Amino acid sequence: MSEQNNTEMAFQIQRIYTKDISFEAPKAPQVFQQEWQPEVKLDLDTASSQLADDIYEVVLRVTVTASLGEETAFLCEVQQGGIFTVGGIEGTQLAHCLGAYCPNILFPYARECITSLVSRGTFPQLNLAPVNFDALFMNYLQQQTEGEGEGAAQHQDA
């Protein structure tokens, strides 16, 4: 039996948690008197760190900025964290797991948190579209191979 067959891929979610939350409405209450046709910008960033053998923390930072003209109506940021057991893979497969698969698991939790914060700020409902973290990760890898990538920041306009 080969050594590769003895090493099985292991994946387990140990914990999903909110690491940091921020909501700002710098122009409230004046912003509520304006017609609501905002420009919404969505910024995503992922970071991962190894906590122990085969145990990793992945943090997905989601920042939503809604602007009316030149003024910021609200700024909402959530850092959604997760602790994952990931074993039996390494290299690009491990990077994909930590940079795409785990953020894909964390995103619905961050999206729900942002939706709740925006609602509590009494702004109209905000529905964030699903994010293709696999495509973002592939773009990141392509930038790295071309030497253009600076950091792991990933951005998308909503």
From Swiss-Prot:
Signal peptide: none annotated. It is found in: Cytoplasm. GO terms for cellular component: cytoplasm. Keywords: Chaperone, Cytoplasm, Protein transport, Translocation, Transport. Its main location: cytoplasm. SUPFAM superfamilies: SecB-like. It comes from the Bacteria. GO terms for molecular function: unfolded protein binding. Transmembrane segments: none annotated. Disulfide bonds: none annotated. InterPro entries: SecB, SecB-like_sf. GO terms for biological process: protein folding; protein tetramerization; protein transport. One of the proteins required for the normal export of preproteins out of the cell cytoplasm. It is a molecular chaperone that binds to a subset of precursor proteins, maintaining them in a translocation-competent state. It also specifically binds to its receptor SecA. Homotetramer, a dimer of dimers. One homotetramer interacts with 1 SecA dimer. NCBIfam families: PRK05751.1-1, PRK05751.1-4, secB. Belongs to the SecB family. PANTHER family: PROTEIN-EXPORT PROTEIN SECB (PTHR36918:SF1), PTHR36918. This is Protein-export protein SecB.
